[in-house]
């Protein structure tokens, strides 16, 4: 439907009923002439409106041109009369002055009531007025205008504004989500790109001739041929090389001790059966001593002669020596003497059986296990150990004497200070806890007030957002094309309501 801005009336000059007169021709002529004069009058009125608007716009344009001319004249005078030798501008003066910034005002609200043309306004005034429903607005509890339920000119704008603001919030939430994921997984973006599959290798193989191309059946699952030719001329199988040169990793003593025969059977056969490559035999030979050395601590007689030469055994025997002290510490009653002798000397086993006969050691054994689990609760047992440890030192006074004091002292020192610290901590912590609780209670009491203040600030922030198309669109464009985290501060509080 076209919007008629100016309508010249009357539109029809001669379409009228004639009165009962004798001279009808003269009557029609007079009526037509009168209607023409009316049309000229309405035309002159619209011409006045048109030329009046043109005059207003021309006057505004002239004032802008005159102000610009004045600025150019002043600038020209400053440029021509400025002498750089006499007047020196300091760097501070240059920095204090603000740079030129264009303040372009965007045209908006073109179809507002104030910008409504006069003829359109006259046409609008000829329409029927809406019912006076605004009189019921004071009686509404929701605060909405009653007339908007009947007619709401701003309905479409409000709908569009709500959609734009929601889209902006969604964009900001998505950006914050990506930032959070990027912080949690910094290496997520460093994904290796998928390799492009080409037939270049295939054509390179076919370049020498079809008869030299190896079929896929001849290649294993790993892409290498099953048979390998070594430099010394021997041929070995890939499976054989893997089985002999890479023996399974040695297990713990507990796992290897129950089945020594199984480990011994596995080690010797590989060199005998798969004896094609010389390197494999060497690898298996080296692997044998290592395996036998691990098994040797549990079964010394059988393991060394079968799996390993006598040479490596003494070299690898010292390392396993430290492990035995922990078992006597757990299973044998006298824990302090074994630990003291185990650290300086290599042969700890003979020392434990010499001390058990003493009756003093038979009584303390039950207490030591509980202290190992809970030192601070039972301080007396550690103190009793030095008294019991006094008799044994006479046979070898220097060695056992030093170890017990540090061991017992280390046990005794932590046992005594904890109670002191425990007694001091409650004294210092009690007032702090009471203060924290009082602060928490005061914060809870002020919860409703704080929540109200937050709601007021949120409402103020929403009101700050411009209620026009240009501001909303500029805000959305800035959010979409910006990567800074400051842009999300405006809608951070909205996450609480999600």
Curated annotation (Swiss-Prot):
One MF annotation (Gene Ontology) recorded for this entry: Arp2/3 complex binding
Transmembrane intervals: none
Tissue note: Expressed in all tissues with strongest expression in placenta, lung, and peripheral blood leukocytes, but not in skeletal muscle.
Residues in WH2 domain copies: 436-453
Keyword Cell membrane among UniProt keywords: yes
GO BP term, example: adenylate cyclase-modulating G protein-coupled receptor signaling pathway
UniProt-annotated stretches for the region Disordered: 173-203, 240-435
Segments of skewed composition (Pro residues): 298-407
GO cellular component: actin cytoskeleton; basolateral plasma membrane; cell-cell junction; cytosol; early endosome; extracellular exosome; lamellipodium; protein-containing complex
Biased composition (Low complexity): 252-263
InterPro entries attached to this UniProt entry: SCAR/WAVE_fam, WH2_dom
Subcellular location: Cytoplasm, Cytoskeleton; Cell projection, Lamellipodium; Basolateral cell membrane
PROSITE patterns: WH2 (PS51082)
Keyword Cytoplasm: yes
Main localization category: cytoplasm
Key words of the record: Actin-binding, Cell membrane, Cell projection, Cytoplasm, Cytoskeleton, Host-virus interaction, Membrane, Phosphoprotein
Pfam families in UniProt: WH2
Phosphoserine, modified sites: 474
Family stated for the protein in its record: Belongs to the SCAR/WAVE family.
Function: Downstream effector molecule involved in the transmission of signals from tyrosine kinase receptors and small GTPases to the actin cytoskeleton. Promotes formation of actin filaments. Part of the WAVE complex that regulates lamellipodia formation. The WAVE complex regulates actin filament reorganization via its interaction with the Arp2/3 complex.
Quaternary organization: Binds actin and the Arp2/3 complex. Interacts with BAIAP2. Component of the WAVE2 complex composed of ABI1, CYFIP1/SRA1, NCKAP1/NAP1 (NCKAP1l/HEM1 in hematopoietic cells) and WASF2/WAVE2. Directly interacts with BRK1. Interacts with FNBP1L (via the SH3 domain).
UniProt remark on domains: Binds and activates the Arp2/3 complex via the C-terminal domain. Interacts with actin via the WH2 domain.
Record's protein name: Actin-binding protein WASF2
Organism expressing this protein natively: Homo sapiens (Human)
Gene: WASF2
């Amino acid at each position: 439907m076209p919007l008629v801005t100016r309508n010249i009336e009357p539109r029809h000059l001669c379409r009228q009923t004639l009165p009962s007169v004798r001279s009808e021709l003269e009557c029609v002529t007079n009526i037509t002439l009168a209607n023409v004069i009316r049309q000229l009058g309405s035309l002159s009125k619209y011409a006045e409106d048109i030329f009046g608007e043109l005059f207003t716009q021309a006057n505004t344009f002239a004032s802008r041109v005159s102000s610009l001319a004045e600025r150019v004249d002043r600038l020209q005078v400053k440029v021509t009369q400025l002498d750089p030798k006499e007047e020196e501008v300091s760097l501070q003066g240059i920095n204090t002055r603000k740079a030129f910034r264009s303040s372009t005002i965007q045209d908006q609200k073109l179809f507002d009531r104030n910008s409504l043309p006069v003829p359109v306004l006259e046409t609008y005034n000829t329409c029927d007025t809406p019912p006076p429903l605004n009189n019921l607005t004071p009686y509404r509890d929701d605060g909405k205008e009653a007339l908007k339920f009947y007619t709401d000119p701003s309905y479409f704008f409000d709908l569009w504004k709500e959609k734009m603001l929601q889209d902006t919030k969604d964009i900001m939430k998505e950006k914050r989500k990506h930032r959070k994921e990027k912080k949690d997984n910094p290496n997520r973006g460093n994904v290796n790109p998928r390799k492009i599959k080409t037939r270049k290798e295939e054509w390179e193989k076919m370049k020498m001739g079809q008869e030299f191309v190896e079929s896929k059946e001849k290649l294993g699952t790993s892409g290498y041929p099953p048979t390998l030719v070594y430099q010394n001329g021997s041929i070995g199988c890939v499976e054989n090389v893997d089985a002999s040169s890479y023996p399974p990793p040695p297990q713990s003593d507990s796992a290897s001790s129950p089945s020594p025969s199984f480990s011994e059977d596995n080690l010797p056969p590989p060199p005998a059966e798969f004896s094609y490559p010389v390197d494999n035999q060497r690898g298996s030979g080296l692997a044998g001593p290592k395996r036998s050395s691990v098994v040797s601590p549990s079964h010394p007689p059988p393991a060394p002669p079968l799996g390993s030469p006598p040479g490596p055994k003494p070299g690898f025997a010292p390392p396993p020596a430290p492990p035995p002290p922990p078992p006597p510490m757990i299973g044998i009653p006298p824990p302090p003497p074994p630990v003291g002798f185990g650290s300086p000397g290599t042969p700890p086993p003979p020392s434990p059986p010499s001390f058990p006969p003493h009756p003093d050691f038979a009584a303390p054994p039950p207490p030591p296990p509980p202290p190992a689990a809970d030192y601070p609760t039972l301080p007396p047992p550690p103190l009793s150990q030095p008294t019991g440890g006094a008799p044994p030192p006479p046979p070898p006074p220097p060695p056992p004497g030093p170890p017990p004091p540090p061991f017992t002292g280390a046990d005794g020192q932590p046992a005594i200070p904890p109670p002191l610290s425990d007694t001091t901590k409650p004294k210092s912590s009690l007032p702090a806890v009471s203060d924290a609780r009082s602060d928490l209670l005061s914060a809870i009491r002020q919860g409703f007030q704080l929540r109200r203040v937050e709601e007021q600030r949120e409402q103020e922030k929403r009101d700050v957002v411009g209620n026009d198309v240009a501001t909303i669109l500029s805000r959305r464009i800035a959010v979409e094309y910006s990567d800074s985290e400051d842009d999300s501060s405006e809608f951070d509080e909205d996450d609480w309501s999600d």
